[in-house]
Amino acid sequence: MKSCEVNFDGLVGPTHNYGGLSYGNVASQSNSQQCANPREAALQGLAKMKALMDLGFTQGVLAPQERPDVAGLRQLGFIGSDEQVIEKAARQDMPLLVASCSASSMWVANAATVSPSADTADGRVHFTAANLNCKYHRSIEHPTTSRVLGAMFADAKHFAHHPALPPVAQFGDEGAANHTRFCQDYGQPGVEFFVFGRSAFDTRYPAPQKYPARQTLEASRAVARLHGLSEGGVVYAQQNPAVIDQGVFHNDVIAVGNGEVLFYHEDAFLNTEPMLNELRDKLGRVGGQLRAICVPRAEVSVQDAVRSYLFNSQLLSRPDGSMLLIVPQECQANASVWAYLQRLIADDSPVAQVKVFDLKQSMQNGGGPACLRLRVALKETELAAVNPGVIMTAPLYDTLTQWVDRHYRDRMSENDLADPRLLIQCRTALDELTQILKLGAVYPFQLN
């Protein structure tokens, strides 16, 4: 049976703004308080989705969250009508309103961890929504994420959904941004690669000193258990604490994997050689042969990797067996990174082509091509069971671009978030979106 890996990209929400909410994310912090353009952000994301669809890749779309999060503000003590809640929050605690308006759910690499059916004990595709416990503005996402994923992958014969892990620091889980799967073929058993920043309970593991390590070993192990993964099909690797302190807040900022290829920076991991040996051995047992591409620090510094988001790229398999690397424009603008990429495709490497995309609105908030997509490997029967409304087609692209043009503002500053009309505009847009994508009722305002 044929299998493919589908990229489900996050649709940027109507409240996209530069709130500077993500401590440890250099781009997010450095662009704080700038004026954002939600319409441009959403259209840039849709353009990438359509381009990959046009290249022959199966492409999906994942809906944004309801923002402002009025229910969350009520939980924190603001009372009155929805408009009064927003007005009071703006007057009394503007940073909290900014957090409650974040469009960070666009980075769906953090939405969940996904294990394909070939790896799981019960032969179903498993999803665990990420608790994103490290940051308030992201910790409020998982209830809606779970409902949206449930509406997209509804057939219990093929799909299993798990709620987020307990929302405490010991089980901090950032989803697929710290998870990669290696395999010889998407439909065959593979090796799932979980990267953690620290251990909550075992002091033998080092931890970063400046910025928080958002993913714990304990969370990664819990997800592997929930998904019914075998010990022989899992490798746990620790991210280098020194690079976390340089702004590498997720593993997908310093490494990317696909198929049998791991593309990573020399400083990405601790104990790199033993980890590679374990990965090579376990992948070999399921018929694969690891190809590790190490980018030397002498050619690309960690700082340049973070600035350009070289590793926050999409590594995609083409029908001829070669790979395509999707990178943001910032890679082309960085001399050392671009020179390295030219050497990479000229060498005898699996990467045959580099394709550049303008994702500036997302990049300025700290999210590149890989942040914007959730990968789901599916067999033909499983793909047929996915809600067809969320699979990108030329007509759906046209419908969504028109929807964005109708509902999105072209300017969003902190003051705009206090406008009570914004809530009405967002709910109107999302209500229409659930009909376009055939999701049913998934947002709090639709459920109440």
Swiss-Prot record:
Keywords: Arginine metabolism, Hydrolase. GO terms for molecular function: N-succinylarginine dihydrolase activity. Pfam families: AstB (PF04996). Its EC number is 3.5.3.23. The keyword Calcium does not apply. Belongs to the succinylarginine dihydrolase family. This is N-succinylarginine dihydrolase. It comes from Pseudomonas savastanoi pv. phaseolicola (strain 1448A / Race 6).
